[in-house]
Amino acid sequence: MKINNNFNIDSLIDNRDVAIVRGRKTDTFFKVFQVAPNIWIAPERYYGESLNINEDQKSDGGIYDSNFLSTNDEKDEFLQATVKILQRINNNVIGAKLLSLISTAIPFPYEYKPGDYRQTNYLVSKDNQHYYTANLVIFGPGTNIVENNAIYYKKEDSENGMGTMSEIWFQPFLTYKYGQFYVDPALELIKCLIKSLYYLYGIKPSDDLSIPYRLRSELNSFEYSELDMIDFLISGGTEYKLLDTNPYWFTDNYFIDAPKNFEKYKNDYETKIKNNNDIANSIKLYLEQKFKTNAQDIWELNLSYFSTEFEIMMPEIFNNALNHYYRKEYYVIDYFKNYNINGFINGQIKTILPLSKYNKNIINKPELVVNLINENNTVLMKSNVYGDGLKGTMDNFYAAYKIPYNIGDEYHINYSYLNNVNVEEINNIPPINDADIYPYRKNSDPFIPVYNITETKEINTTTPLSVNYLQAQVTNSNDISLSSDFSKVISSKDRSLVYSFLDNTIDYLDSIKYDEPIDTDKKYYLWLKEIFRNYSFDMTETQEVNTPCGINKVVPWLGKALNILNTGNSFIEEFKSLGPISLINKKENITMPKIEIDEIPNSMLNLSFKDLSENLFNRFSKNNSYFEKIYYDFLDQWWTQYYSQYFDLICMAKKSILAQETLIKKIIQKKLSYLIGNSNISSDNLALMNLTTTNTLRDISNESQIAMNNVDSFLNSAAICVFEGNIYSKFISFMEQCINNINKNTREFIQKCTNITENEKLQLINQNIFSSLDFDFLNIENLKSLFSSETALLIKEETSPYELVLYAFQEPDNNAIGDASAKNTSIEYSKDIDLVYGINSDALYLNGSNQSISFSNDFFENGLTNSFSIYFWLRNLGKDTIKSKLIGSKEDNCGWEIYFQDTGLVFNMIDSNGNEKNIYLSDVSNNSWHYITISVDRLKEQLLIFIDDNLVANESIKEILNIYSSNIISLLSENNPSYIEGLTILNKPTTSQEVLNNYFKVLNNSYIRDSNEERLEYNKTYQLYNYVFSDKPICEVKQNNNIYLTINNTNNLNLQPSKFKLLSINSNKQYVQKFDEVIISILGNMEKYIDISEDNRLQLIDNKNGAKKMIISNDMFISNCLTLSCGGKYICLSMKDENHNWMICNNDMSKYLYLWSFK
């Protein structure tokens, strides 16, 4: 799909791609630009809404400015920005398909008279002289400048399968943050584009089709938020997984009627349009492309899928319910500086955008104001709870909803993802000309604005709620004093006093109040290190508690952070006593679902045994599916009523983590700023302190991420525990009633049947009676998978702990050396470095002639607080080794280094103040492979070093402070030849168990496996199979007095499987490893050995000395298969030669014919 970017606001009117057109049902005119076939941009505020409305009509969280987008400069910026976002979408394969589909999805022509078809998707010029085909017009925002939406032209056509054109309101310049990342405007536009497809395809759900979304636990009344079905389908995310179930309990005729309506017009196209010569060929070609994609395909287009395809971060769960407790802030995007066709230039996290001037104009109409009052009714603090942007209802959906018996299995997810959209074919469709358009004048409804008017409710409480505690952790002051006394904080007039639950951190800050001032870099580093360590201990603490669902890692600070259970320090004890259900406020009884199960019709009473058996089995299967719908009714009630409350806690807890992180960072930054302005520390040291502090602030964010993950795990486990213990048991009880009734009716019916014997009746009863095993639907692992990773707020865009993963392999012309950590590492290396086979793959051969490899990326910088691990395989080829560098990251004699000395290795750490740690590792110069692991844990102030699977050093590094060095790691070979394999650096310490796992995993990977994944052994008897013919063993065939090897593909009973044995060149080896040199023998009356004949067939000989030695290796992708090679050629299976596929030595066959398996 080509996006036309050659426009500006002053482009001349050509009545083809640039025109002045009339708004529907109005006398408003505006300039439009066709940026893709049938897709237009109107750089104007949306004409259908007044730009000046009453205050009571303004929505909470909205921004209103009648002057926005009023000048030509602003309009041109809007045009260019929107084009760039469309180019970004088009730059991805699936994005290009989406735009192509919108381009082709013209509404079905209206049949004005029999055979007289007229177009409904058009714009008309000011003088009514020109018509322009339009499926979509993208406008600037309407009254509320931060509201994006898609609206239909004609409601009836948007729902009846005919389709109608669409208009979009869009704000490209303002975005907001979710957690730590900016929301990408491309995803915001994609959401509107998908919604437009529902209108263009005529498959829009009715406005009253909505589902309960979350229980509003912050209100005293029992109230739900409701989500429109179209938004539910488009949003994707975790909630969509509940729909991705067959069958799903929630049903409506929409999922039946929408495809039928669409198919009706598809059939009309085939019978009435396709061969109609009065309709322009371009229109028919567009319709032909449109009807290649059906309604089910559109249902599969959701934001989760596009975010994955575009690698865009987005909130994955409860999309519309995230901002209850804080006001969203907007940031300004500069499309020349911050954004290109790949998205934010520096990523969604690292990009820095300025706050918008409009933030001060955000409408503040909270859904609820919580007044915390004392015994004298004096208001101590006011806290706002904002709406979730959804309509609310007091109706109990579940009490009124009846689970249908005869419908509900029609909607299945098919995962087509626009496979039928052919972008190239669509690009070749000629444009629809002015003369091709016969307009239907009644193609639109008048646009009627809808205002979301919020009424603020107010409650008083003497018991502080979570929102009160959360508010007490936030301050705008730069002078900060932390206090763990909530009452003191809210009663104090001291604006610097802020509530904190970080007990260790507070105790440390209190303990140094009267110490000597911090006036040197060393004192600052000691202070900063202790702040970091105490923050980590406070924030990442968990305690294991036995619950009915097993051991649960509880986050003990949660009670103090949000006043949950009102228990202060006894949160753990109260949780043990009251269980996971105690964490939420509302514990409503599950509504027992209304069900309808058809009676067995009397018409079946006289059926034969065969027919009756078949009919009863069909009913049995249908009832079983119906039970599954009932199960999902219970699951959905838990999701909306219970899990929504746990998710609220997750959101608030994470907000609390970020609030505490902000407080600690402010304290650190204030201290550094003071030292920069008021100390006698040298400028060089201040510069180093500044760089080190930046890294420590990053490490603090990483600790916050660990805390967030702990919260996710704890509260999600608690929610699942409630489902398993409180909800599923009610489901079982309800099901027992259901099946007892069904079983009773089934028995009675079968007993009344007149055309079968008593034995046949007994057989049918046994076959069609339900037992408790038939409805065991609970799968805790599947339930856990709903929360596999979606709720974590990402701190870093790169989540892998690996900062370097060295790989090397041989290419035809050179050796490739690189990094597999996905950290954009820059690598420079000597071109004369050779590769040899190592422990598990190719290893670097550093021959001691000043060869080097240099790695650099943004993640290598060491500092004061970052933990890290280094591990690699080493084979030292030197003997009397003089001091020789091997690996290091040092600058100005600060950092870490590994070097050879005498007959061993030395690990050296030295900080910027000259504090040093040297650990000598002996016995690694014995010409053998060794696995070296070094773990630096700055929280425990511990250095661990392992050789192979043995811990050889456990040292304190308490005295080591800042080891800040450059972002370069060097791998050198000054004087000592050595092999290096698998050099890896992680941003975390390594445990003894992890070392053992890594060590033996690599060793295990070097072993060849048999067909059962067991290690292949020497001198053990096997049968041999080729991968392609996995059921046909290798046999011996005598031909011309020679014995050859082939598969038995003729079912010749005289051919028996041969018995193979692998013989090692090294008589002491038990197990076969990669690249071993082997001799293969075949057992029979006499032991024979494999040789290769002149025609390259494998033949058997009597003399072992004449046998060919073969190199054995495993396959990278199929672990229980292996390859055999001899003289640089692989052993494979030949194509069929008469009745035989021979084992031959040949490099010209298909890959899989080279794969073998010993059984």
From Swiss-Prot:
Residues 796-1159 are annotated as: C-heavy chain nHC. One of its GO terms (biological process) is proteolysis. NCBIfam families: botu_NTNH (NF033911). Belongs to the botulism non-toxic nonhemagglutinin family. Coiled coil: none annotated. Induction: The toxin locus has divergently transcribed operons maximally expressed during early stationary phase. This is part of the p47-ntnh-botA operon. The crude toxin extract was isolated from cells that had been growing statically for 96 hours (at protein level). Part of a botulinum neurotoxin type A2 (BoNT) locus; may be part of a progenitor toxin complex required to protect BoNT during its passage through the host gastrointestinal tract. Keywords: Virulence. It holds the Pfam family Peptidase_M27. Residues 376-795 are annotated as: N-heavy chain nHN. GO terms for molecular function: metalloendopeptidase activity; zinc ion binding. Residues 1-375 are annotated as: Light chain nLC. Signal peptide: none annotated. GO terms for cellular component: extracellular region. It comes from the Bacteria. InterPro entries: Bot/tetX_LC (IPR000395), Clostridium_toxin_transloc (IPR036248), ConA-like_dom_sf (IPR013320), Nontoxic_nonhemagglutn_C (IPR013677), Toxin_rcpt-bd_N (IPR012928). The keyword Zinc does not apply. Part of a crude toxin extract that includes BoNTA2/NTNH, P47, OrfX2 and OrfX3; OrfX1 was not detected. A purified toxin complex has NTNH and dichain BoNTA2. Forms a highly interlocked heterodimer with botulinum neurotoxin type A2 at pH 6.0, called the minimally functional progenitor toxin complex (M-PTC) (BoNT/A, botA). The keyword Metal-binding does not apply. This is Non-toxic nonhemagglutinin type A. Shorter forms of this protein are seen in vivo. Has 3 domains that are structurally very similar to those in BoNT/A; light chain (nLC, equivalent to the light chain), N-heavy chain (nHN) and C-heavy chain (nHC).
